[in-house]
Amino acid sequence: MTEMTEAELMKLLAAITPPDETARAAAHAHWASLAKPLGGLGALETLLEDAAALTGTAQFDFSRRAVAVLCADNGVVAQGISQTDQSVTRAVAENLAARRTSVCRMAQAAHCDVLPVDMGIAGAPVPGVRDCRIAAGTADFTKGPAMTRAEAVEAIGRGISLTRQLAAEGYGLVATGEMGIGNTTTSSAVAAVLLAQPVQTMTGRGAGLSDAGLARKVDTIRRGIACNAPDPDDVLDVLGKLGGFDIAGLCGMFLGGALAGVPVLMDGFISGVAALCAVRLCPAAAKAVFASHCSTEPAARLVLEALGKAPLLTAGLHLGEGTGAVASIPLWDMALAVYRDCYSFTEGGITPYTPQC
């Protein structure tokens, strides 16, 4: 795999164009022609208008969809910030490959392919999992940077390549997921710095920490930030010092979606932080970021607000793996079914509605 340099990454970011407002207007006009109250489908109408602005066309094909589940281990787990150890990352990755996990069952119902990806699982590569690994896990960020700046760039580059490859294979909709013990800790650390928020505000219980465990997690993040002194105006510095290979790879996936013109669905808090990194690197990349749900992690809503994105679902989800993103896909299908096949005012012999305000 050819390594990406920072200069090459910056060149790609410069190629990301603003949304196509002509295509957005065409999608809006089509919605307005259908025999229903104007804006009656609310966020579902906005969804396809935003997709038109991204893809450059008011005609869509989301029949092929995939969820990419990026798996990676985090050295900060050594600080006791999780109920489980790194062996669980590998175990879940193996079960993703065997199509036995929660997201696999949900994806089957949503007619969505599942692509488990190894961005940096501790130990040897996992059979049946796409090998995009940067290293066998990150370092403990309480003792120094989690990864080098070059590794952060490379992880982003591999995420970009992943989305672009899926687009080339004909996928019209890409959902994001992740698996990595300790990644709510890394996500909270990155978000606290980028959003200039207190660590305690940005930190939750993850997979179910006790009060003592939560206090240890908050203290660990504070020590990591103090140790590394990341520059909040330099996303690559923050990602490299406090992030994980999964977050960096997901960041790249959103950037890849902006380059390829493919909607990329956020899952919960972790992929939301990755999307925030992508948009901080390139504001125009926001056109490829589509929210699915609002996680119960305390900082999830703050991240969504920073991105200016509204979730389609609020269902108390906090499982990970991309389950929330996949859960939103049927709403895309229903929106498109109405958009494509609902009769128009003209076809129904009905006088069109006109805006009254």
Where are the regions that the model predicts?
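N-terminal loops that bind phosphate or other acidic moieties
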Residues: T2-C357
